[in-house]
From Swiss-Prot:
InterPro entries: QTRTD1, Queuine_tRNA-ribosyltrfase, TGT-like_sf, tRNA_ribo_trans-like. Transmembrane segments: none annotated. Zn(2+) binds at C334, C336, C339, H365. SUPFAM superfamilies: tRNA-guanine transglycosylase (SSF51713). It comes from Drosophila willistoni (Fruit fly). The keyword tRNA processing applies. This is Queuine tRNA-ribosyltransferase accessory subunit 2. Binds 1 zinc ion per subunit. It is found in: Cytoplasm. Its cofactor is Zn(2+). Non-catalytic subunit of the queuine tRNA-ribosyltransferase (TGT) that catalyzes the base-exchange of a guanine (G) residue with queuine (Q) at position 34 (anticodon wobble position) in tRNAs with GU(N) anticodons (tRNA-Asp, -Asn, -His and -Tyr), resulting in the hypermodified nucleoside queuosine (7-(((4,5-cis-dihydroxy-2-cyclopenten-1-yl)amino)methyl)-7-deazaguanosine). GO terms for molecular function: metal ion binding; tRNA-guanosine(34) queuine transglycosylase activity.
Length: 428
């Protein structure tokens, strides 16, 4: 993996190019980059063909290559099969020619806290908790042969974590990484690139310690950084307070080399993503679009500076009875398959009748909208207009700041009244 910084604007962040040589011949990806979040190696609700033909391929143009975000917590059962697989990991998953990065935890689901023993890191799978030693982790990496993988770390921290818990996360990560750095050189035949984890919660001193440990490694030991330990994944990431998060990230970025890529996985809100890009973070994922879809929300926030219509909410609630007779697209002027072929009333009907097509159409729209958002971000940086985009996304042509946090939708379809509507449950 090679990363080239192409352009840095003082007011707008930076543009870069990520060159992956291991993805079946080599691909180039522009940054700021949006990884495609997967579950079990598949994009949620979408087959590989559906994604390529109706999301990745826009207006009949040649599909732009993507970087698949894979998570060990949803794929650990594949290690034995992949050890015998002769081709690339992306080819095994049905996405030949695409890049991939293997992370530990699923950013779409809340990660349980605890289980952090001295010499193991826990991952929580569908089969329960599995404890990973550094030795076992590197065996899995040798089987998966990902294009990029993150170093083993203890990222079980958030804003409420105690100083003791934060320090333990840093110390444990250093012990894990001492072994990972040593063994990574023996994986060179796989062409896998390593991301050094930077942990330490919201403690500047702990973050600095984590950075120093990574930077004291010999040149070439790793290819970039992954900043973790700010949240416990899932919906919690959508509600993070930028005033507390951004100063810590900015402190970290200033201490890291400019020529190394910086990744922050998690369902960060569009506004937080823009602020992080302004600071210098390069890679994010689509878990926010997924979290919105599974909670019956279509993304409709505005990022087109030509539009002057105020939007007090960034979402359209598909379960809202008010849209059951609205025969208009989910979002005006949207070019996705869902908005071109279907209406709000139809998608509402699909959810009301519990049809599988409902989440498929909603996921297509949300991914299309979020990918278009990143295209606009790159264009804004090139024109040094990112501050204007931040202001637009923040206020949505209104007078006050818009709330982008996603709350769990507790509306369910009663089996007794399927087709008649939704009712509210008290389930947490």
């Amino acid at each position: 993996m090679k990363f080239l910084v192409e352009n840095i604007n003082k007011n707008s962040g930076r543009l870069g190019l990520l060159d992956l040589k291991a993805a079946g011949g080599g691909i180039q990806l522009k940054t700021p980059l949006l990884m495609q979040t997967t579950k079990g190696g598949s994009i949620p609700y979408l087959s590989a063909d559906l994604f390529e033909n109706y999301v990745q391929n826009k207006n009949g143009q040649e599909p732009v290559p993507v970087l698949l975000q894979l998570t060990l917590s949803t794929m650990q059962q594949m290690a034995e099969s992949l050890a015998l697989w002769p081709a690339s990991l992306s080819h095994y998953l049905g996405f030949p020619g695409q890049g991939n990065v293997l992370l530990l935890r699923d950013p779409c689901e809340s990660t349980p806290s605890g289980g952090n023993d001295r010499d193991v890191a826990p991952i929580f799978t569908r089969q329960g908790k599995e404890s990973l030693t550094p030795e076992r982790y590197m065996e899995i990496i040798a089987s998966f042969k990902p294009d990029i993988y993150q170093g083993l770390c203890d990222a079980d921290t958030n804003l409420e974590s105690s100083k003791k818990r934060v320090q333990k996360s840093v110390d444990r990560t250093e012990r894990f990484m001492d072994y990972i750095y040593e063994q990574h050189g023996k994986l060179q035949s796989t062409s896998s690139s390593l991301l050094a984890p930077i942990v330490g919660g919201y403690n500047i001193f702990a973050r600095t310690q984590s950075i120093k440990h990574a930077r004291q490694q010999p040149e070439g030991k790793y290819s970039g950084y992954i900043l973790e330990g700010f949240h416990n994944n899932g919906l919690s990431a959508t509600a993070l307070d930028g005033s507390q998060l951004l100063p810590i990230v900015e402190h970290c970025v200033k201490q890291l080399e400019e020529n190394k890529i910086k990744m922050m996985p998690g369902a960060y809100s569009p506004l937080i993503i823009l602020e992080l890009i302004h600071i210098g973070v390069d890679v994010f994922d689509t878990s926010y679009a997924y979290c919105a879809a599974v909670n019956f929300k279509a993304l409709v926030f505005n990022y087109d500076e030509k539009s002057i219509e105020p939007r007090p909410t960034p979402f359209l609630d598909i379960t809202d009875e008010a849209i059951k007779e609205e025969f208009v697209p989910l979002l005006d002027n949207c070019k996705c398959l869902t908005c071109q072929k279907h209406t709000r009333a139809y998608v509402h009907h699909l959810y009301k009748t519990n049809e599988l097509l409902g989440p498929i159409l909603l996921m297509i729209h949300n991914l299309h909208h979020f990918m278009g958002f990143f295209e606009t971000i790159r264009s804004s940086i090139a024109q040094d207009k990112l501050p204007k985009l931040i202001d637009l996304v923040c206020k949505q042509n209104g007078d006050s700041k818009v709330d982008y946090s996603i709350e769990k939708n507790v509306k369910v379809i009663s089996k007794a009244v399927v087709g008649k509507g939704f009712e509210t449950t008290t389930e947490s």
